[in-house]
Amino acid sequence: MTGNFKGVIFDIDGILEFQGKVYPGAIELIDRLRAKGLVIRILSNSTLKSREYCAEKLVKMGFSIFKEEVITASYATARYLKRLNPKSCWVMLKGKGFTEFQDFIHDDENPAYIVVGDYREEFNFQNLNKALKLLLAGSKLVVMIPEK
């Protein structure tokens, strides 16, 4: 069954679960693949959710998943930003995904980078205008696609 594969990547929503319900056989499949020695990675394109939140949710549903196996859009973006080593950033993001950026110096007045995620109701003219002025003054932009 494993062939030349070293690992398997699963999306959370619509693959492992949908609207809070586990797809039949999904838990057993992951357990079986793990028992065969395959590396498991779980992906979510959500900017609102942290790795920890996703792992905890899946564990409550019966999956044997570890936080380190989960990659969310906010986590991947925070890792990318860390490689850039900015002096500061303004993270326009709400929800648990914001916790992935806790190690950065946050500055919404003179950030080196502006990170845009799902900012919900605070994604308004005032903040967009502020971001545009900061970009024109030299801040750089990193964008995540908001959740639908």
Spans of model-derived segments:
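HAD-like aspartate-dependent phosphatase fold
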Residues: 2-148
